[in-house]
Amino acid sequence: GVWFEEEYKRVYPNGSLAADVIGFSRADNEGQYGLEEYYNDVLNGTTGREYGYLNDDANLERTIKPAVDGNTIHSTIDANIQGIVEKYLKQFNEEHKDAVHPGNGAENVGCIIMEVNTGNILAMASYPTYDLNDTRNTDALLGSRKIEMVTNANGYDVLTKTDTYFTQEDIDALTDDELLDNLNYLWKNYCISTTYEPGSTAKPFTVAAALESGAITGNEHYQCNGSLEVGGHTIKCHSYRSGGEGDVSVQDSIAWSCNVALMKIAA
């Protein structure tokens, strides 16, 4: 005889919301990227089975092994805050699209919002992003820089950004491997998978350490002429071209992100 069996799979009712954080599951229900991959064994249940045979009286003898549901996980992401962040990341890119170069307003934009008293992550988003229910939709690549596999000076194959900003014609010309390379770059969580030096985010800690150690009182003022010689190198402030910030208080050094004042504080 013929009978129907239910099939279970994970779906995403909110589409692209928190795509970087959530990740997605493949056709075989294996998680890929994000929470889906990290907690795959927790989220995946056990598939039920039904089998049987016809006995001597031609009656069907059935055996049913019921499915076991996977577990539920709760993240600290606030869907309302996440939605607002994603809205404005997209708005920024639409406003600046094609302004400096063809394509998106920025190659990547990321934003993390944290609850400072607990460390809970309330929102984590980047742009461009994608729909979790349609992960291979190439519309998400439009305006992004093309990624190519190249061999570096050490003989290693590495993914490198080209000077090409995707048009539909560029996407249509990709081989299957090239398309997968570019989709994999899109699917990763930009906020936590791409490394940069901490830069100005370290400045509040420099001032805090100076205050706590007694190296400064907080009432000092520093003169910024736009650059400072340190160890035989000229380190510039963002105000270098305009001749520097001039008189900078400790508070202003953070508010204006003044490199010269911070170097003098750290010294």
Residue ranges and their predicted role:
Residues 1-70, 87, 94:
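Small/polar-residue-rich segments within soluble enzyme cores
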Residues 3-5, 20-24, 74-76, 110-114, ...:
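Soluble periplasmic/extracytoplasmic beta-strand elements of cell-envelope proteins
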Residues 10, 18, 23, 189, ...:
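Active-site-proximal helix/loop microenvironment
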Residues 21, 84-88, 118-119, 195-222, ...:
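Active-site SXXK
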Residues 29-33, 67, 75-83, 186, ...:
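Soluble non-cytosolic domains of exported or imported proteins
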Residues 63-67, 79, 83-198, 233:
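Short pre-catalytic segments that frame enzyme active sites
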